[in-house]
Amino acid sequence: MLLNQQLVQQFVTQAIAFGDYEQEDNIYIQNQLLRILNAIGIDVDNESPLNQDATANAIAQYWIEQAVNENYLEDALYKKEIVEAQILDLITPRPSVINRNFVEAYKKSPETATNYFYEITKRNHYVKEDAIANNINYEVETEYGDIEITINLSKPEKDAKQIAKAKAEPAKHYPKCALCIENEGYQGSVTQAARTNHRIIRLKLDGKSWGFQYSPYAYFPEHSIVLSEHHVPMEINKQTFVNLLAFIEQFPHYFIGSNADIPLVGGSILSHNHYQAGKHVFPMDNAAEIERFTMNQFSSVTASTLNWPMSVIRLKSENRDELINAATYVMNTWNQYSDETIDVRAFSKDGERHHTVTPIARYRQSQYELDIVLRDNQTSEVFPDGIFHPHEDVQHIKKENIGLIEVMGTAILPGRLKEELQQVKTYLVGDNQFDLGIHQQWAENMKRTYDINKQNVDDIVDKEVGYKFKRVLEDAGVFKNTDTGRQAFKRFIKHL
């Protein structure tokens, strides 16, 4: 395999412009490219196959495809990702340089600092904008406000060979998980993501060391992860609120929140303490207040319930310390609270804890805000997946845990729905009747409800998906939006 000389020079120019290199390093960079791609030399005879303004990532993708076509690289997703990360590491400054530059940029403003880091992660294809653009996104109007629907098509599917090879691989213990700080610069394997071009900003939250990185497959603008330096389990306690507000103090243009810390109502990774942050206004942010109340022991804190399908208490204050204490009080009270009339139980008979919260922090209108979303992970014979989990009749749309992002009103729906929903639409407007499997009853209900034709079928199905997600959130709410549920919520507030 030979690398086109003009492409090499285009890449070298960008490595010098964006990486740690100077003009005298051009031969060194060229030889690193030959090593990474297992190439045998430089093609000096042919014109560049790409435009002069091709990005480093576009050049890397061209070389990877060339290497596969010429049998220099196995056509396996993980092998291609490892090579891509190694190539694009050459246009990425070292972690120490990025951290130093981040601190300098922060002196201008927090937003200048995050913009600097975000641009690097997009340029070196750690944040995969091209893949993220494949997601299907739209909004649906509901009585709670507009909710956001995302059908997740960004993450590439592993093929059967890679899955089989991964199963045969011996268990790896370094890094311990996908969030560990040791992933920075890690080569990757069939079971672990390629992270050679990965960089982490070091932060202090309440005097402790944390890392800040962007998410490769973002669900919203500047989707970032704040991770503990140590591999310790998720835990929601007073320190969580301290950390969230410490982050907001440093980066007031971002929100930050945490998944819950117990199964069924938490995120997919409970083994490593982390939060998610970013620059997005979620539907729940704009939810209207229903009832304001005060807690006498926290005079500077205003509290309210929200017009939202899940059960949320919003706390606001200019006094950060009192807000932390109020949030801790609400959480501790909820963690011990039971109401048998609505199947809310803090503990099972054997003492297992069932209650926790999903907290979200933001800085708005010169006040700190903490949204405390009440969670309960009980199961029952009637609801084996969870009493406050998507029930069986909506699981054809969403059956996974309802985590932080969904709680705030953004559905992350599985990629299978793209094809399945197209089949539903074909069924609704066609004469040919065929079995839709898990979507059959839903489709029949739509046929009875609407006068459907080819002009309106897309809007109807999109809207009904939104209504299903609204139901998903209502299922996850502990105090339902019914007379009984509202009275029960008032009893809890009185208990506070």
UniProtKB/Swiss-Prot annotation:
GO terms for molecular function: UDP-glucose:hexose-1-phosphate uridylyltransferase activity. Transmembrane segments: none annotated. Keywords: Carbohydrate metabolism, Cytoplasm, Galactose metabolism, Nucleotidyltransferase, Transferase. One of its GO terms (biological process) is galactose metabolic process. One of its GO terms (cellular component) is cytoplasm. Pfam families: GalP_UDP_tr_C, GalP_UDP_transf. Its main location: cytoplasm. Its EC number is 2.7.7.12. It catalyses: alpha-D-galactose 1-phosphate + UDP-alpha-D-glucose = alpha-D-glucose 1-phosphate + UDP-alpha-D-galactose. Pathway: Carbohydrate metabolism; galactose metabolism. It is found in: Cytoplasm. Belongs to the galactose-1-phosphate uridylyltransferase type 2 family. NCBIfam families: galT_2, PRK05270.1-2, PRK05270.2-2. This is Galactose-1-phosphate uridylyltransferase. It comes from Staphylococcus saprophyticus subsp. saprophyticus (strain ATCC 15305 / DSM 20229 / NCIMB 8711 / NCTC 7292 / S-41). The gene is galT.
